[in-house]
Amino acid sequence: MIPSDFIDELLAKTDIVDIIDEQVPLKKGGANYMACCPFHKEKTPSFSVSPTKQFYHCFSCGAHGSAIGFVMEHQGLSFPEAVQFLADRVGMVVPKVHGQNDNPEVRAERKKKQQTLEETTAAAADFYAQQLKFNPAAKAYLDKRGLSAEVIAHYGLGYAPDGWQPLTQVFQPYPNTALVDTGMVIDNEGRHYDRFRHRIMFPIRNPRGQVIGFGGRVLDDSKPKYLNSPDTPLFDKGKNLYGLYEGRAAVKEAGRILVVEGYMDVVALAQFGVGYGVAALGTATTAEHVKILMRQADSIYFCFDGDSAGRKAAWRALENALPQLKDDKSLHFLFLPEEHDPDSYIRAYGKAQFEDALLNQSKPLSEYFWEHLSDGIHLNTQEGKAELVKTSSPLLAQITAPALAYLLKQRLSELVGIDPDNLAQLLGQEAPKRHVKQKNYKLPPISVKQPVMLTLVQRQIRSLLINPDWAAYIDLPDYLALDGDFACLANLAESIKNHAAVPETAQVLEYMRGSPYEETITRIFHSTHQSEEMNSSSEEDCENFQIGMKKLLNELKYSQIETLKQKSLQSGLNESEKKLLLSLLTAKQN
């Protein structure tokens, strides 16, 4: 059995939109993403994916679930296999449950600690955003950079006040363990002080929009120019990209994603209408970054300064990308004039010229690959040709995209003038092919059902699944006899309330997996055919939910009264039952 807190953390680090979009091309449709359902044949898209609730639902066949459920159904995997698949993607290790991992108290404590860390970074982000309003120098700096209030708010920019311990204004006691564990406060041999001081603050968010770390930029020319959060339980700089959450819609619209070097580049580009930029977090572009980028778009562009540092960073990105390359993905590299970075270039020339340079002057990976490797090599000599074969061989061996690998080797053959067959012998054994076990996937025999009218309690169950925080409005007394759908509603509410933080829909669905109520939930989703029914989260909807709970409670009490009356006539009541009946009748009269 895999611990529930691990499942929660896995779902928190997994974006269901990315998972499904790799298999089923999604298109933005209002707040959600839509596609033709992969689980039955249809011409009009009725398959909806919610990025906020992290679950999918088909309004025709009723298919629904979390990212785990989608992987299970679409790839034919078991629950443990699907969990392992998703864990591998985000760099998590599936725990072996034994010893203390079986202890619910240990799991609850670990989950509580995680929640405390998340609350700490969120509170710090709010504090920095508020401080920006009161610091003239910080506001003047952003005004000088031409950033609008809308862009500042979109990226949540803030200001870390000068001084050793400004976070004492919002955190008491100071320091505390969470401040140190999130990297907000430095512990220097017992002396504690804020990591970020007198800097413009850039909150770093995970795919769910939660603040997991920060980048801070100086307002002048002092060093270091950028200061980043260290790796923490929330934040791994090698597996996150700045601006990815904020730019997701722009990436979808443009069909491409752009990697730049600095946070300010990302924000400045967005100010000029290029909102699909992201930046690595104080490190070179890693293999994990490349995997993330390829999940976002088919076309990935890298934009670097034209100086030696920029070119070195570009080559490092290319090297880390080689094992991740796919034949249906393309990488491009743009080098700006040495006097410019993306921020200054787009300010000088505007969006149109910047995007023209990006699309028409950038070099595809295949061109940049040979240009870099042959730089300084005299290909008009035999020695130069031999050197190119030697330096390119280990790099070519890393490429598992079959068509691209073949074409690059063919180009090497042309550059050095060696027959492809002879060149293959020189290169040695070809890079091993990745043998992935393929499963013959067939559309499951799900028939599209006609709408079925749901009862009030079933509608309440659906509303609770969509809005888990509404569990606060459910209070069913212990003396009420609950079975069927009523028991399902009560169990759902109890499962939600038992967690320190309100879970999302995807997590609630996983709580119910394998429970006696899983079939009830499936039946309710199969009977939901209108998108409005899955987006009922307004204040009016919440009021209707509370009214519905009052009706259900009265219905249950009436049923309990009738049951007790019948028993009284047939076999009599014991003392506790008599008191309960009297209490219910009195309450009914009042």
UniProtKB/Swiss-Prot annotation:
Q: Which GO terms describe its molecular function?
A: DNA binding; DNA-directed RNA polymerase activity; zinc ion binding
**Gene Ontology biological-process annotations:** DNA replication, synthesis of primer
Provide the residue positions that the database annotates as binding Mg(2+) 1: 261, 305
The EC code for this enzyme is: 2.7.7.101
Cofactor entry:
Zn(2+); Mg(2+)
Q: SMART domains per the record?
A: DnaG_DnaB_bind (SM00766), TOPRIM (SM00493), ZnF_CHCC (SM00400)
Entry cofactor note text? Binds 1 zinc ion per monomer. Binds two Mg(2+) per subunit.
Query: Which sites bind Mg(2+) 2?
Result: 305, 307
Q: Which InterPro entries match?
A: DNA_helicase_N/primase_C (IPR016136), DNA_primase_core_N_sf (IPR037068), DNA_primase_DnaB-bd (IPR019475), DNA_primase_DnaG (IPR006295), DNA_primase_DnaG_DnaB-bd_dom (IPR013173), DNA_primase_Znf_CHC2 (IPR036977), DnaG_bac (IPR030846), DNAG_N (IPR013264)
Pfam short name (any one): Zn_ribbon_DnaG
Q: Where is the Toprim domain?
A: 255-337
Q: Specify the residue ranges making up the CHC2-type zinc fingers.
A: 37-61
Q: Which domain of life is it from?
A: Bacteria
Cite the record's note on assembly: Monomer. Interacts with DnaB.
Q: What does this protein do?
A: RNA polymerase that catalyzes the synthesis of short RNA molecules used as primers for DNA polymerase during DNA replication.
Note on domains (UniProt): Contains an N-terminal zinc-binding domain, a central core domain that contains the primase activity, and a C-terminal DnaB-binding domain.
The protein in question is named DNA primase
Organism of origin: Neisseria meningitidis serogroup B (strain ATCC BAA-335 / MC58)
